[in-house]
Regions:
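Active-site segments that bind and position negatively charged phosphate/pyrophosphate groups
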Residues: 138, 142-199
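Short glycine/serine/threonine-rich phosphate/pyrophosphate-binding segments
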Residues: 45-52, 73-74, 192-193
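Short glycine-rich anion-binding loops that position phosphate/pyrophosphate groups of nucleotides
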Residues: 1, 43-46
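A glycine/threonine-rich phosphate-anchoring loop and its flanking beta-alpha core
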Residues: 52-145
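Non-catalytic interfacial helical region
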Residues: 24-41, 50-65
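Glycine-rich beta-strand-to-loop/alpha-helix junction loops that act as flexible
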Residues: 10-11, 41-43, 186-187
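ATP/NTP phosphate-donor binding region
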Residues: 1-37
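Short hydrophobic "helix-edge" motifs at membrane interfaces and signal-peptide entry regions
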Residues: 6-7, 57, 94-96, 171, ...
């Protein structure tokens, strides 16, 4: 059967609250019901929009996610947070609505420029660092081949698995970002301010 497809341009403008409204209309016009499921394939912008829309469409429907960026694979795919921009304010609103299924395909990382791999590796380093010396030592060992540029998909998969296990600990300890999990937000406020100032 033909499945309806909604294409979303992965830009900060697409994450604006007003820009998400046509997505709700498109889902309705495509005939999605409460029992339907959204399958999101893409990076962080697509994930933010899919999380937000799936959480609100008909008061919430299931969704699954296939991250295509290293940052999405190593971090944001797990946790179920959405972040939506309002006016000049980045990530002002959002909610929690985790995907019911996540499929990580390391082959997508082969399509990414080195700067994208470095960005994902930096976030993975921060996650490991926040957990402690043992987790960070494991990160250093597993990340070395990826950072060298000479890596096999199995090596990337091992790094992703270790990173997501650490993040899972934070989520299970503090699902809604009230205590320990807030450590993972380290650097985000400054980073978002810098992005806004240089946009």
């Amino acid at each position: 059967a033909d499945l309806p497809v909604i294409w979303i341009e992965a830009t900060e403008e697409a994450k604006a609250l007003q820009a998400t409204l046509p997505v709700f209309v498109a889902l309705k016009q495509a005939g999605l019901a409460r029992s339907s499921r959204i399958a999101a394939i893409g990076g962080g912008v697509v994930q933010d929009i899919a999380t937000f829309v799936a959480s609100l469409y008909m008061r919430g429907i299931a969704w699954s996610y296939v991250p295509t960026t290293f940052l999405g694979m190593a971090d944001s795919c797990l946790g179920g947070k959405s972040s939506i921009n309002v006016g000049p304010y980045k990530n002002l609103i959002g909610n929690f609505h985790p995907p019911s299924r996540i499929d990580i395909l390391p082959v997508f990382a082969r399509t990414l420029p080195a700067v994208e791999l470095a960005g994902g590796a930096a976030e993975a380093a921060k996650i490991a660092f926040c957990r402690g010396a043992s987790a960070f030592a494991a990160y250093e060992r597993l990340a070395a081949p990826v950072l060298s540029g000479e890596w096999k998909e199995q090596q990337l998969a091992e790094l992703l698995h270790a990173t997501l296990r650490v993040k899972q600990w934070f989520i299970e300890t503090d699902e809604f970002d009230q205590a320990e999990r807030r450590l993972l937000n380290f650097g985000h406020t400054w980073g978002h301010a810098l992005e806004s100032a240089t946009a």
